[in-house]
Amino acid sequence: MDFSIKINAKRPYKEHDNLFISVESDRGRILNCAALRRLQQKTQVFPLERNAAVRSRLTHSLEVQQNGRFIAQSIIRELSRQSNQPQLLDSQHADALISLVEMACIMHDIGNPAFGHFGEAAINDWFNNYFSTHPRYSSAYKHSQHGEYNGKDFAPFLIRDLCQFEGNAQAIRIIKTLSNLNLTYCQTASILKYTRCGIEAKPSKAREKNYLKNKVGYYYSEQSFIDELCDKLNITQGNRHPIAYIMEAADDIAYCLADIEDAVEKGLLSVETVINLLKDEYIKQLHSFQIELHEDFLVKACQSAQKRAWTNPDNYATEFFIYLRVELIHPLVKHATTRFIDNIEAIYHGSFNAALLEDNSYQHAITNALKQVALKHVFCHGEVEELELQGYKITSGILNEYQRLLDLPEEQFKYILSFSRHYPIEVRLLKRIPGQFIGAYSKSVNQLTRAQSAQPIYEFYYRCRLIQDFISGMTDQLAYDTYRTLLVID
């Protein structure tokens, strides 16, 4: 294992030989990226939330960043203690690892659309419905639901790609195509959580790499870039970069407790209710894993946090979650570190087909208990469900209006791009789309081969991508305002 292969200064262009300078450059590019700033107005659980104490995607990402830093430091410390092993990380690569992990964590959600997973569902449902009845592509859509590419008609696979919108894949598209951040390959690879291209079918549970390919990790539009990235970092196709495992664990630790805390902040649950729910769910998870030890761990953690929180009754709920987080993060980080080091060979090569915190251990039971309480008692709350339905309706409604641009033949759409007066409605719709997205569309179409240009599906693929880029780039508030404007709701 040579981590200098996985952590280096290579980037698509204008690369610098110095690793420190390259990693610092990545930090600046990411922190100054508009897509990152938009996370402050994208939902974590509660869309269009006015209470600033409730998490947005940005504040969640900051918490993930801290967890990632903690795990990375813990891994470096434990590796340095292994005197019987050759040194895997020198000080230069150890420092780079921490920065790469931090930036992976802070930008891991930049591809998520407005209204979170309901926004994703709305986009996918809309495009599935659109293609299923499309006069030209309905047959290709039917073929897209199964089968592998036979070297003839590629349309079904491009349609499959378009009907599998995924925030993780959109993040790769933002980095490479839309914002053109020109990050180091290792920094981009650090957020490649899933390794399946959108043109591939989801593998069965019995298939190799079924976990790594559980969701779409990148689109066909970025496939050549991912091939290039894997070549530069010596990553086998379908495998991960080692840092992606750390980022994933940091995210798992952060969101499972944060969602419950936000529910308490909004008055949907009380601290005492949370304690009882966690106690019952944790025991249930332990039994499902057939674990008899550590049954009192979560109860003791809650009691300790509760006892310390009562010293400041005026800020009881906030203090409780501060102390509970401390009680939980340390064992979870320690476990993630142990799993990383115990499986370091497979993790180095990116073939480890599991999450660090998912191994049927009591630590796994902790995170599962937190997730299940959130799922059963936060996400299903009437207020949350109402907001999710509104988000679904808003996203679908905007797509309905922009269908005009998709229904045009290619030649007529080209007239629209020059703001032709013959299409006043379509031109006004197009003008609302940011220039960077239109530029990305034009560049992609201009780079098509002659054979691809002769097949209308390729231009249409990038036109659909243009609409998805526009919709998914909106904040919750912008999507809400756009919907009201287009449907004349005052």
List the predicted regions and their residue ranges.
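Extreme N-terminal flexible tails
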Residues: 1-20, 24-27, 427-436, 442, ...
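Sequence-structural signature of the catalytic-core scaffold of metal-dependent phosphohydrolases
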Residues: 1-19, 27, 31-42, 51, ...
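Intrinsically disordered or highly flexible coil/loop and linker segments, enriched in small
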Residues: 36-40, 132, 136, 180-184, ...
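A short small-residue
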Residues: 42-52, 373-378
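Charged, amphipathic alpha-helical oligomerization/scaffolding segments
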Residues: 63, 249-252, 328, 332-335, ...
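Long, amphipathic alpha-helical stalk/connector segments used for oligomerization, subunit docking
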Residues: 297-360, 368, 380
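Substrate-recognition/cap regions that form aromatic- and gly/pro-loop-enriched pockets
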Residues: 341-443
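C-terminal amphipathic alpha-helical interaction region
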Residues: 416-489
